[in-house]
């Protein structure tokens, strides 16, 4: 028995440790973590996207296709089964919440639209149009009405834009056909996505080309329609345009539609892979052609209500089409750009963006543009689906594919304003894509085997990340940038293959930007219209608004500065960053933080219409000691290094000081507020100390006794005016105006 037991134990003990280690150790492997992450993303995504994307029939049909293509039969089946607009469920719910939060009645919405149009017409044509009060600026309610009412409103604001009943009935039928065509196109785009975002898909690229060409054609039609509407309005109110310029769109609608129907990307390819899509876009363009005939041939009512009713109906039509086109562009930026050859540098995408930018340049005062980040906060399903699909693709491929890296590099080149240098490309290692969990190594890096060089680890000195920030040298030309100076959203850092940080940008949260529920607007100064077809659409010509996915409890409007390279353009889920996240506080309390070596940094992060805080309302440069208004020779020279950059908003004082008329000192002193601090980067502590000491010395050595305020006021009342009409005063940074010597002697004699 003992021998048998001993023999049995010997046999069992041979692989006991191996079996226990393999079956008993539960330490997760990287593959386990990736699988769990993919499944978690799938569970979240299934609840907020259209059910047809995860249907059994679609999954089985795509499983037997060994290419990254989706046949049109699968797309058509998903479109037919989605009878309740399931693809738009999340977005439509958020839009209706925004409309409900406006608390505006039907008549108040009417007033919002008509007042907005009168202001737009006055600024675009120069006609003397009476504006009945302010438009309410760019508040949340106004922007919600202008963007969402025509698409998700319960009923139309203006039902009878024409004079006779027949044209009104035909117009209602055309609107229903147009909405049906828009829904079919949006469904097609929603369900045409392949399963792998990191693999090229030629069929999907062709369909995207067809959609983007369709967007370009529609935006050109909108410019033609606004030319027609503005001309008829001015004619009906017996006004003529003061600003004379050519038509904003020179081609007639029939030529625009014919050009797309005969030579569009889907028709020109001749493959038939986008036959259903080309039919849907053709249906929408034909309806627009019928509407062109209606608005051209049918007359309006001659009374005031008839003209305003036609205006409101026209604005409703424009916002309906514009919202549909924005849906297509924002969906491309939310993920579909990965299937475009060249990424954001694709020619069809650039053409569509230019058309949208041109429309915004001329009509942006009337119709705003929604940023992709705001759109993604409302349409969460598309962004979440692409995160899930990318995670699953990385697990399958093991690393990002070259095709996907090319798309990422095209986006990075737009963000930095120039192409990345040679060698600074995204690596195929997932660690090359930094996120919120990335952190520097906490110890020396081990040297590879048989290596003669030791692994080194160098900790960043305090402030080194801040000083190494590289700002864009020029603002991106993409229309998705709402400012002249590019504002930066998201906390991202593009790294090269050596791991060196090449760009460190701030989160939009540092500009008081609410990442998830932004309920603000981005107003800006808009330049005059131009009739040139080659006019560039700079970043100062786009008005971005941001809508919350749920109504704001306070109703406050947050004016902020959104991102912009392709703003549109950043990951839709950045996290707010601590303003001091790029600076590590030193242990030594006497340590003085080094100043940034980038002189242009402060000015590049400011908006084009930025008004400096507490800027003096006189033509002297901020930071200089105050002098007499009449005696310009007493203006002291600015300390070395205190001058702002040439392109700064405060560098216009010298020119103003030459030609500006004399300013009354009473007015100057009443409106002047001392500057809290000098914001120039090169204005160091030494210069501040010297300036403060000189001012203190001037106060100590000031001649003459100090009189009480009562005597001073009594003397001013009894003083006779001089030949120049007022008593000369000297501006001081520390006290009230000093008196003229003659005035001081008179007060002393009293």
From Swiss-Prot:
Main subcellular location of this protein, as a coarse class: virion
GO-annotated biological processes: regulation of DNA-templated transcription
Ranges of Basic and acidic residues composition bias in the record: 710-727, 739-750
Keywords for this protein: Activator, Host cell membrane, Host membrane, Membrane, Transcription, Transcription regulation, Virion, Virion tegument
Compositionally skewed regions (Polar residues) per UniProt: 465-484, 541-553
One Pfam family it belongs to: Herpes_UL46
A cellular-component GO term for this protein: membrane
Region called Disordered, residue ranges: 437-484, 525-593, 610-669, 692-750
Topology of this chain in the membrane: Peripheral membrane protein
Localization per record: Virion tegument; Host cell membrane
Composition-biased stretches (Low complexity): 528-540
InterPro entries: Herpes_UL46
Key word Thylakoid present: no
Purpose: Modulates alpha trans-inducing factor-dependent activation of alpha genes.
Family designation: Belongs to the herpesviridae HHV-1 VP11/12 protein family.
UniProt name for this protein: Tegument protein UL46 homolog
Organism, as annotated: Equine herpesvirus 1 (strain V592)
């Amino acid at each position: 028995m003992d021998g048998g037991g001993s023999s049995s134990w010997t046999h069992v003990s041979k692989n006991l440790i191996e079996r226990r280690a393999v079956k008993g150790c539960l330490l997760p492997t990287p593959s386990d973590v990736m699988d769990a992450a993919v499944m978690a993303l799938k569970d979240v995504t299934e609840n907020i996207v259209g059910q047809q994307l995860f249907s059994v029939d679609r999954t089985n049909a795509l499983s037997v296709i060994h290419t990254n293509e989706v046949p049109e039969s699968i797309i058509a089946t998903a479109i037919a089964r989605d009878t309740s607009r399931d693809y738009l469920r999340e977005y439509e719910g958020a839009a209706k919440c925004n409309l409900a939060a406006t608390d505006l009645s039907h008549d108040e919405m009417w007033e919002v639209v008509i007042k907005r149009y009168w202001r737009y017409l006055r600024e675009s044509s120069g006609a003397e149009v009476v504006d009945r009060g302010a438009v309410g600026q760019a508040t949340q309610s106004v922007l919600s009405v202008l963007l969402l009412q025509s698409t998700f409103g319960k009923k139309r604001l203006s039902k009878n834009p024409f004079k006779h009943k027949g044209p009104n009935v035909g117009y209602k039928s055309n609107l229903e056909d147009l909405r049906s065509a828009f829904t079919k196109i949006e469904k097609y785009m929603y369900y045409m996505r392949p399963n792998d975002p990191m693999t090229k898909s030629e069929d999907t690229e062709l369909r995207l080309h067809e959609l983007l060409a369709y967007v370009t054609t529609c935006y050109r039609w909108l410019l033609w329609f606004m030319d027609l509407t503005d001309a008829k309005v001015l004619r009906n109110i017996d006004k003529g345009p003061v600003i004379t310029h050519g038509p904003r769109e020179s081609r007639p609608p029939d030529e625009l539609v014919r050009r797309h129907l005969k030579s569009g990307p889907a028709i020109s390819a001749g493959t038939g892979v986008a036959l259903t899509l080309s039919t849907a876009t053709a249906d929408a363009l034909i309806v627009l052609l019928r509407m062109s005939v209606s608005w051209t041939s049918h007359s309006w009512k001659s009374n005031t209500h008839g003209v305003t009713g036609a205006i409101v109906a026209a604005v409703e039509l424009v916002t309906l089409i514009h919202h549909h086109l924005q849906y297509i562009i924002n969906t491309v930026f939310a993920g579909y750009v990965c299937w475009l050859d060249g990424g954001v540098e694709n020619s069809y995408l650039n053409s569509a963006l230019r058309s949208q930018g041109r429309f915004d340049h001329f009509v942006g005062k009337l119709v705003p543009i929604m940023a992709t980040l705001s759109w993604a906060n409302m349409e969460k399903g598309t962004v979440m689906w692409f995160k899930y699909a990318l995670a699953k693709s990385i697990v399958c491929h093991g690393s990002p594919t070259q095709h996907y890296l090319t798309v990422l590099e095209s986006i990075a080149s737009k963000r930095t304003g120039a192409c990345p240098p040679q060698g600074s490309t995204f690596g195929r290692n997932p660690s090359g894509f930094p996120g919120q969990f990335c952190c520097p190594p906490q110890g020396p890096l081990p040297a590879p085997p048989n290596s003669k060089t030791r692994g080194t680890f160098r900790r960043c000195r305090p402030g080194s990340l801040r000083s190494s920030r590289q700002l864009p040298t020029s603002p991106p030309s993409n229309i998705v940038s709402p400012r002249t100076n590019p504002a930066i959203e998201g906390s991202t850092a593009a790294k090269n293959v050596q791991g060196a940080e090449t760009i460190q940008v701030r989160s939009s949260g540092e500009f008081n930007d609410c990442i998830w529920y932004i309920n603000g607007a981005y107003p800006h100064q808009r330049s005059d219209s131009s009739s040139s077809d080659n006019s560039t659409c700079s970043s100062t010509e786009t008005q971005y608004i941001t809508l919350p996915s749920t109504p704001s409890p306070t109703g406050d409007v947050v004016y902020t500065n959104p991102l912009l390279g392709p703003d549109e353009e950043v990951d839709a889920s950045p996290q707010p960053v601590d303003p001091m996240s790029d600076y590590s506080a030193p242990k030594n309390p006497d340590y003085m933080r080094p100043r940034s070596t980038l002189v242009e940094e402060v000015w590049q992060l400011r908006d084009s219409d930025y008004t400096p805080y507490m800027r003096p309302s006189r033509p002297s440069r901020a930071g200089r000691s105050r002098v007499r208004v009449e005696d310009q020779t007493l203006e002291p020279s600015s300390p070395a290094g205190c001058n702002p950059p040439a392109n700064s908003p405060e560098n216009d004082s010298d020119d103003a000081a030459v030609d500006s008329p004399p300013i009354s000192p009473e007015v100057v002193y009443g409106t002047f507020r001392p500057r809290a601090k000098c914001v120039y980067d090169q204005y160091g502590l030494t210069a501040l100390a010297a300036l403060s000491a000189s001012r203190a010395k001037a106060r100590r050595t000031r001649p003459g006794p100090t009189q009480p305020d009562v005597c001073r006021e009594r003397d001013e009342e009894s003083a006779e005016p001089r030949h120049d009409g007022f008593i000369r005063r000297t501006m001081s940074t520390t006290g009230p105006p000093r008196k003229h010597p003659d005035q001081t002697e008179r007060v002393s004699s009293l």
